[in-house]
Amino acid sequence: RGLGDVYKRQVQKYIGGDSASPRINKLSGGEWKAIKARAKAAIAVFAKDLIDLYAHRKMEKGHAFEKDTVWQKEFEDSFPYQETEDQLRSAEEIKRDMEKPFPMDRLLCGDVGFGKTEVAARALFKCVAEGKQAAVLVPTTILANQHYFTLKERFENFPFNIEMLSRFRTSAQQKNILSGLESGEIDLVVGTHKLLSSGIKFKNLGLLVVDEEQRFGVEPVSYTHLT
């Protein structure tokens, strides 16, 4: 059920270069109509599941974070650049949402180089400073590496344990990271789709930041919002 079925049978745009030639159907034929009907039915099922999921989320209670602390101010004041008005407004709105007693679901949009990472960093700091864990989900290992080192540098003056979970880590390192997430030893983790694996267990996850959310698809990201 759900998005997987849609992908298996949905009508797709043909892209050349595939090893197998596409099967041709007559537009007026019964087989083409059946294919479209299956795709529509699968989409309807997935849409219902998604609506049920969002309704369930609305009934969930979330953790209400405390107001900004002196430590939060120190972290934000350590930013070496002048913030833009949009950065300041977005960061404040996100932090105010985190202080409400229900799960936050926010979309932050901005062009490359406009400071989205710093806005996310301030939310991540607010989370881990209160003893919760935070995760940053990214679509590629290159982005994971980039965000990991950026956040390591940004948090270097504060006593938080930051790790990265991707193919850049050996099997032994990944095992230790998984153990650290479950025990609470790791405060902040940056990872690829591995973070969506069923074997991942957090001791006290308080915030999930998804970079380039559109590259993960609706279904996996929507279900992670329940964590």
PLM feature spans:
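Conserved Walker A/P-loop ATP-binding site and its immediately adjacent core
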Residues: 133-150
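SF2 helicase catalytic motif II
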Residues: 201-226
